[in-house]
Amino acid sequence: MSQQLKKILIIDDDDRNIFALKAVLTSKGYSCITAVSGLQALEIMQQQNDISAALVDMMMPGMDGYELIELARETSSLNHVRLIAVTAQAMMGDKERCLAAGADAYISKPVDIDKLLQVLHGPLKQKG
């Protein structure tokens, strides 16, 4: 990771998932903030322009991850945020659905930390 500390927004309606991801990412030198809903996450991303990536749980009550990602992609001030779909849905077509919504990457639960770190450091998906 570069010298600059990267800020990650973890969005999940399950506190256990937030706790686990935050513990690992903090130990790797990331600064983490959290949201428990899509609406709260969108508000945070609009208020804090130093968020480099968001880990988005796709299945949440209210505004789900798909809607959050679509809204974030429609907001030009959020184009710099790497949106990573994190979901327990791992059936055929789920990855494609997440990427079609605008996610830069897809990771299934339980999260493989090595894969997550690769996604955080890798190139952003080309926007068409």
Q: Where do the model's predicted regions map?
A:
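Active-site residues of response regulator receiver
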Residues: D57, T87
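Charged docking surfaces used in two-component/phosphorelay signaling
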Residues: F19-S27
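Short hydrophobic/Thr-rich beta-strand motif most characteristic of the beta2 strand and flanking loop
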Residues: G29-V36, I44, I107
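C-terminal output helix
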Residues: V111-L120
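Receiver (REC) domain active-site loop signature in two-component systems and cognate sites
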Residues: M60
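Conserved Asp/Asn-Gly motif in the active-site loop of CheY-like receiver
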Residues: A35-L39, K95
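Active-site beta3 strand of CheY-like receiver
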Residues: N49-L55
